[in-house]
Amino acid sequence: MICPRCKNQDSQYFYTFKNITYCRKCVKIGSTCFSPSRSPSIIKTVDYQLDYELTPLQNNISRQLLQRYQQHLNTSLKAVCGAGKTEITYEVIKYALNQGQRVCFTTPRKELVIELAKRLQSQFKNISITTVYGGHSELVDGQFIICTTHQLYRYPQYFDLLILDELDAFPYVNNEVLIGLLQNSIKGNYIYMSATLTNQPDLLMTKRYHGYLLDVPKCYLTSALVMYLWAIKKIRDFVRKKKPVLVYVPTIQLTNTVARIFKLFKLKSHAISSNTKDIQKFIERFRHHQLDVLVTTTILERGITIDNVQVIILYGNNRIYTTATLIQICGRVGRKTAHPSGSISIFTPYKTRAIKECLKTIKQDNA
């Protein structure tokens, strides 16, 4: 027996009650009572508008994505943080929508979905984008859907084009149920994208859109006490220069502790984690310089772009900081043309293998 949703074949997860068989591996994701419309979509004249021109490299990759989709090929794309990988999917999205096909842009985390939906809805014309995530699922039908990977259970064999951004992000990575739900939602072809793919990609972008190199982090080998004193000194220097600071810590409990410590030194700080309600509100306050510092877990390792932001990583030896996580965190810096570089500081008692691999990878991408 194979579960039609998550593709589970392990018999211990199947349970039959009143002649109905359930898969306990994916039943907690949600019921299957909703059936999206299967009627053919009306062909539209969908277009998009950017306030900037794509670089020659972006245009080249964009054309290749479109050509591969027209040839019914799946594609994996590795693009360094800040390469502008979202924008290079617009041509293939436009093509699919104008063919009357159904398109999904999916990513593992709700915060990324909210950011993406706001951005794409302002750039795409003549199409209403349906946004679906936990707590926001009143409307789930549509031709162009942006959703978390958890919500794909609603769409069996539904999408002609599915774009998965950050496929190596928690909670999707190594999650057999979510992987199965995603595969089951595709009836056409997919594009998988990330800055930290481990397998050889079909397409590769090693340069940021503005042409500047990736910032290489500096490691400070120090004890916890000295770490805090050094970090506070750095943050004060940044604040004087009106530079916002993202401080990463490995646990939720530490976000609150560190934010309180910073407040003792008259720094306007706030803690962000998966427990935080209305994360976007605090990100906007941070973006508009109403906060000096956001102390965050790895929930903000991806998908956040703040102009002129500086990054500090505390307790860099913690196991939560994998090579991929560190590369993504470092990629928060220098994403805007006005401020294409910045400071990344890792405070740790010693260099872990992940830190060494992060440094090696960034230097190789810059070569």
Where are these regions (language model features)?
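Interdomain "pre-motor" coupling segment immediately N-terminal to P-loop NTPase/helicase cores
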Residues: 2-42
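Conserved segment of the helicase C-terminal RecA-like domain
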Residues: 187-199, 207, 330-361
